[in-house]
Amino acid sequence: MTEILKDSGLLHNFMIFEYEDVQPSKSSDGIVTMKGIIQKAQQPNANNRIYPRPILEREDAKYQELIKERRALGELDHPDSPIVQLENVSHVVTETLWEGDDLIGTIEVLDTPKGQILEKLIGRDIKLGISSRGLGSTSRTNEGYDKVEDDFNLVCYDMVSNPSTSGAYMNLQESREYKTLVNQNRMVLLDEILNDILEL
C-alpha cells in the first residue's frame, strides 16, 4: 500500500466516553470515578484517523509507569500543548486494560478547580467525551485514512465535550445511567456551575 506523508505534530483523538458505573466510590470518601473506552485501535475515528494496535499497546505499556506513580493526569478540555498544565488538571487515570481493540480506562476525578467543574458537569447528567493527546505524524492511506505512524508518543487523556472516537463517552459508576446529552444553553449552564463552585 502506498502512503503519503501528511502531517506531524500534536495529535488529538476525541471519543464519547460511554462510562459504565460512574459513582462516588464507597471506599474513598465519595471520590467520583468513571470507567469506559478511552481509545480504539484499528478503526477510523471521527477525525478520519486510524491508530494501529501495536502502537497503542506500546504507548499504553509506557503509560503504566505514570499510572503506577499517580502521574497519569489529564485536563478539562483540550489544550494545543504537549505539556499537561497542573493548574488545569481535573482527573487522573488509575487503570487501563484491553478488551479486544478497545482500551478501557478508569478515571478518578480530582478535587481541583477543574475537577470540581468536571464533577458538577457529571452531576448535571452531561455526557462527556475523552480525548487522547499525543505527538507524532500521520500518513495518508490509499483508502483516504490518516494512519498514525510509529513516532507517536502519548501525552495524556483529556475530558472534552466533543470526542471523535465512537463509544468514548464515560459513565458514572453509579446505579443510574447517564443518557441525556445536553446540547442547549451550555454557556448558561457553565455560568451556573462556576457560580456554584465560587459559593462553596
Located regions from the model:
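Charged phosphate-binding loop/patch that engages nucleotide di/tri-phosphates or the phosphate backbone
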Residues: 190, 194
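Secondary-structure transition/turn motif
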Residues: 35-45, 89, 106-113
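Polar/acidic, low-complexity leader/linker segments enriched in S/T/G and N/D
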Residues: 1-65, 182-189, 199
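A short, polar/proline- and glycine-enriched secondary-structure boundary/capping micro-motif
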Residues: 46-48, 85, 115-119
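A structural signal for short, hydrophobic beta-strand segments that form beta-sheets
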Residues: 16-22, 38, 85-95, 154
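Short, flexible beta-strand-to-coil junctions
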Residues: 38-44, 77-80, 133-141
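Residue microenvironments linked to proteolytic maturation
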Residues: 4-7, 13, 73, 92-186
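Short conserved beta-strand and strand-loop elements enriched in small hydrophobics
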Residues: 69-84, 130
